[in-house]
Amino acid sequence: MQKIQTDILIVGSGLAGLSLSKYLSEINPNLPILLLSKTSIDECNTYYAQGGIAVVHDFLKDSYKQHVEDTLKAGKGLCDEKVVQHVITEAPKRLNELLQWGVELDKNSQGGLDLGLEGGHSQNRIVHHKDKTGYEIETKLIPLIEKLPNVTIKTSFFATDLIIENGHCLGLKGFDEKGEPTIIEAKATVLATGGSGQVFGVTSNPFVSTGDGVAMAIRSNVALQNMKYIQFHPTAMFEPQKSQAFLITEAIRGYGAHILNSNGERFLLEVHKNGELATRDVVSKAISEQMKKENGKNVWLDLRHLPIEDFKNKFPKVFNYCSQQGFDITQDLIPIAPAAHYQCGGIIVDEKGATDKLQLFAIGECSYTGLHGANRLASNSLLEAIVYSHDLADYLTSTVFTTQLKSNENTVLTYKNIHHDEVLQFRNQLQRFMKYESIYGEKQAIIKTYQLVSELLKRFRMKYKKYDNHPFLCETYNLIQTAEIILKESLPVSYKRNKISKKTKL
């Protein structure tokens, strides 16, 4: 079993992981950093992010106060206001650094940054690169990181578990690209593993978003919070044969798109004064209720009234995808339905990204900073990632860590071949159980799904005594464990109380 040592270990190659590597290297160019990616370095949620980054830029019309208020309102009273203030006031500085790193953003006719509008925002403040902002960020940052002599990148590395001793995180174990069992010792370990959208049957997230960081945290008794708040994006294209849904950016609704029911009515105007530009939780719930009312599987996005040439210029990715699927947006309505999109809860961290285990940190979607509360405001996620990576870099480079890994029998991994199709059955069953109604539906639906997933977890553990001897097996276990914690938090209080009461009597 091979061992690797480094000062800083970063698990994940989205904006959080990449920008942390860059910030650390700017402060200390000689700092040894190891960056892990589960597959290719660009396969992550950031790569697929369409909308942009929320930044107060036009101070004649907008203000930090307005952005703060919009964020707090979207979060339904569960945001940490101190965190919200900090992230939003830091945004312009972090945006300037992205621009210095070569990220190109759209300009308006006057040569300034073009500011888009999205749901829940009271002002235009979304900076963007057409409808593929995340792609632009990833493709500009990756070459910068690859050129840094102090950063080693390992792709196709699957992390199975953290190594925790006496409350300290000493690194992790996993399998390298050849399937070789590996221990990585680190003075500081940073989880930037992204979200858990693949827990659900329909998601906008790529196949790598399997809750790995959260699941490793669960197994190491690292504190989590608000895992039940999974954000569903209201406008994913309805394609029943696909589990990874194509996202239709919220910016299109800011541009003027309408959402219609089967009668061609803009039903959202009856639900909220902002109609299509209400926050994502409001729009997704309204769509779900409308589909239930109609006994249908989708509603419709109307783009027919929008100026076609300008639309093609601003949203080329969406236009091309619609065309490939046979839709003429000047004549056809686009079928849409909500899809699991963002994990608002996660690993609890403080203002510098530290967890409740020493030398273990978390940033990005896998973390819970308090910024998003119960519902993330559109385009605040990339902002959170870069602000926290900057702050964590400052902390890590000003802190002296001393650590010694004490290898023992529990850290030994052995690679074992598995029956892929048998493991896949567990994953498929989970995704059939997990849908919007599983966490936001009627009480009995939530309880039923929790019972089904708990039973699935029991069967998995009975069949596979060891989950960590193959990446696909461990990843499937991560999905089921993450689903159970999401559902456990979603259970009605009365159900939890009754279960606790029965256990006490026993």
Language model regions located:
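Glycine- and aromatic-enriched mobile tails/lids
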Residues: 3-6, 20-23, 29-32, 40-42, ...
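An anion/pyrophosphate-binding glycine-rich loop and adjacent beta-alpha core
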Residues: 216, 222-332, 385-386, 395-399
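Conserved N-terminal glycine-rich FAD pyrophosphate-binding loop of Rossmann-like flavoproteins
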Residues: 39-72, 76
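Short hydrophobic core segments
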Residues: 9-11, 184-193
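Short beta-strand to alpha-helix junction loop
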Residues: 79-92, 125-143, 154, 203-211, ...
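Beta1/beta-strand and adjacent pyrophosphate-binding region of the FAD-binding site
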Residues: 2-16
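FAD-site-proximal beta/loop scaffold in flavoenzymes
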Residues: 161-181, 327-369
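Conserved redox-cofactor binding core of oxidoreductases
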Residues: 100-180, 192, 236-239, 259
